[in-house]
Amino acid sequence: MEANMPKRKEPGRSLRIKVISMGNAEVGKSCIIKRYCEKRFVSKYLATIGIDYGVTKVHVRDREIKVNIFDMAGHPFFYEVRNEFYKDTQGVILVYDVGQKDSFDALDAWLAEMKQELGPHGNMENIIFVVCANKIDCTKHRCVDESEGRLWAESKGFLYFETSAQTGEGINEMFQTFYISIVDLCENGGKRPTTNSSASFTKEQADAIRRIRNSKDSWDMLGVKPGASRDEVNKAYRKLAVLLHPDKCVAPGSEDAFKAVVNARTALLKNIK
């Protein structure tokens, strides 16, 4: 009789992980963590001094996860403090303020700082990164749109979420996906799962969208010199049209970039005899 009874499923073994937050001062790193861990929002800004440390427990599938969170100060003054905390990290919460373009532009510098501190033997490919486009509740002041932020994140194989520490929007979903990805990382021998490491578009497509977005005029948008001939304009247009056509390119912002290229070509050809 006992031999035919269903076996009780053994609970998954516990797991300890290290998570750090990165990003400029005042982007809301601490507020995001407090919103998730303490279910509250602190409206008064209190700058993080050096490092804030906290521990929380979560459950992913059948495993208990003990999360050690190191909330790192974003001010350059605290570099000598935070540079000791990059190593042995499984997950990074990379935060910028959608109303502060400089905080978005600084993301590359934060990655460079981490890479430098990990040294030649450090491998950032085996760390789960989640990008939080924070303060989306401040719609009037937004200057970094979703497609721009998502393009940057996904081109690097990072997770991307739109969040508001004030309202709580996107916070729980972000952390749940983040922790699941870290558990998958640990269960995959410390290697980032393929689904999280490869973008569904090319670097050439991502670079073209960024260039078009930041171009100063129609000539610059098509990548031709002012005064270019009709044939040169059409040749440049065809190359970009093939690269970015919405039917073949799924990169965030590709549809807007394609429309901008079409409009740029039309505007230039009107003035070329």
UniProtKB/Swiss-Prot annotation:
The keyword GTP-binding applies. Residues 1-18 are annotated as: Required for interaction with MAPK1. SMART domains: DnaJ, RAB, RAN, RAS, RHO. CDD domains: DnaJ, RJL. GO terms for cellular component: cytoplasmic vesicle; nucleus. DNAJC27/RBJ knockdown in several colorectal cancer cell lines is correlated to inhibition of MEK/ERK activation, cell proliferation, colony formation and in vivo tumor growth. GTPase which can activate the MEK/ERK pathway and induce cell transformation when overexpressed. May act as a nuclear scaffold for MAPK1, probably by association with MAPK1 nuclear export signal leading to enhanced ERK1/ERK2 signaling. This is DnaJ homolog subfamily C member 27. It comes from Homo sapiens.
